[in-house]
Amino acid sequence: LKSLQDLFLAADYSLVHSELTLQAIQQLDMFHAFKQAKSMWFEDALDALEISEISGWPDRFGDALLKWNASNPVKDIRTLSLFSGGGGLDIGFHDAGFNIVESNEIVPAFAATLEKNTADGRRLSGTRIVCKDINDYHPDLDNIDFIIGGPPCQTFSAAGARAAGVNGTDDERGNLFIQYARLIYKLQPKGFLFENVYRIVGAQSGKPWQQIQAAFEELGYKLYWRILDASDYGVPQFRERLIIVGLKTGAFNFPYPSHGPDSGDNRNYYSAKQALETVINSDNIPKALGGRHGHLLNDIPPGLNYSYYTERMGHPTPFFAWRSKFSDYLYKADPHTPVRTIKAQGGQYTGPFSWENRPFTVEELKRLQTFPDSYLINGNRQTAIHQLGNSVPPQFARVLALSIMKQVFSEKIPFDIKFMPANYELGFRARKSKLTDVYALKAKEAIDKIPSSINNAAKHVKHQEYFCIDSDLKVRAGLSKEEASYFVNYSLDSENWTINVSEPPIGIDEVKYKIIIQPPRTDTVLLKSTIELTSAINGEYSILVLWKIFEFLLKRHFLKDDLIQLFGYYQYKKSYQFKMFFQDKSLSDNNYWNVVKKVTEGIGVGVISSFEELSTEFGCSSVELQDILSKMKDYGFEIRNHNTNRQIQKGMILIPYSFPTLNERSLQRLTRL
């Protein structure tokens, strides 16, 4: 197979470079014929199940499997489901003919979903549901043949990584695989399937992955694993997951994809639009997004996200900095492809959103996850999304379960599935790496249609105004001098910005300190202006006031959403230079202000350091530094340690930014060092 792949690449190269030879054509034809013979199986599956690939076909696929199993009973494969969640794996294995005798789930709302679907006549009828912490779960079960489940994966996820590294097995949730292993040891099944996020393989330099493999192998199981994309198996959603199959005896190969470029017949992906064509929604269709960013969704082309509004994409009003948000922020699904991964949790602007510029309904999300229309989901909208987003798509689970049924238990299945050799390389990662260029082209096509006058950012503004900052860090402007706490005199033009903050009524106090910001030569937002922020207030709180008022004016006049969108996410290269100067020389003798100055200028910022290292860097004792950093956190600086972010080890500190970033919506504002 490998040599034929090489032949294909050689033939493909010849075709691309217009060196069309008879040998190249013959090689290409030979490879395609070989590939189809070895890897194509889904068309035969449709024929065997007597279904067609129309909207909602995964439901009919599952129903046809159940019907076939009723007429062709297999031996009783007693299966235990752990971390069952909303039941995605349970549905897939049940439909494939496994007997799910018991399911364990700790969250009552999720267990209630399972209970609803185990009633007489429901899909999982006959399964016993145990709502209990797995640490306290001691099942009294005999002759368990197989175990399925995936422990909670948040500690290995992209969100966990972005919070300041990946917790992995340093977090209690990351160690739940030990309980999984405990039950395998207790029940001694013939095999198991373990599902998790793919990042687990590289988390913490591979240490957790090595621990997981060692734990299972020590129990006497040989592991077969791959990172697979659910869209390759008929799910209208790009969803990469690590799948481990552990066996006491025998061997296992994963199935060839049924859909996409890696399938034997190059079958089209099951698109989001096709999946939703026949969905029946309830009357509770979500309205268009509201809030400060909701209106932005309307103009985002399908398939793109917040990055449409970045300077990198060429947008004339770049609200956001490149890579300053998660990839699902304001992500609008493309109807002609699978959607990106549906997440269990997220904020108001977490996608995917419909191409109709609204959130998807629960019924639509069920289709995008291939949950049966008839499957009951307990709870309100957010609870339902939590369950769906945490689940293995049932259609993906069906294909895996059938593959296990055939290879591990030697049972007949209604059609032949073709299995990949262990060294066969899938191409979804390579295709994913090319998407940035595709998105850029799509963005350019939309941006080229925007009238040049749309950028209404101010080119010259000079004004005086009264402000107030509430205790929750919310800025209020346009006040009377009696209502206000601060008087602001500012001038914004193409060469210089000057913003002076003082106390009412007329702001004639002497300047105490100033901050000079030098934009990079590539800046197109501030028009290369030098920015001078000055404060005539020397109270410790004034550093927050100065930055917050600058941020407010930036958003009002230059359409940047916040300081991070201007200066960039802390893990990326810094392009703006900050300098702080004390006009009031007494500030130089104050450790609080010396620490603020160093942080402003980027010293000790953006890296995780020990308390001792920062104490030396800032020239103060650990006790005093703790007090200063706590004050700065109260004043809006995002200071992180183990108490605020479990990903950070005890005794370590992270100051992500040189300026205060917390606002009235920040949960970090409520945490304490």
Regions found by a protein language model. Give the residues of each.
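C-terminal target-recognition/interaction regions appended to catalytic cores
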Residues: 1-59, 65-70, 299-673
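Core alpha/beta nucleotide-donor-binding catalytic domains of modification enzymes
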Residues: 44, 49-188, 198-210, 217
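A structural signal for well-ordered alpha-helical segments within the folded catalytic domains
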Residues: 87, 108, 178, 206-210, ...
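Short phosphate-binding/catalytic loops that engage adenosine nucleotides
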Residues: 98, 221, 637
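Class I S-adenosyl-L-methionine
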Residues: 137-146, 156-331
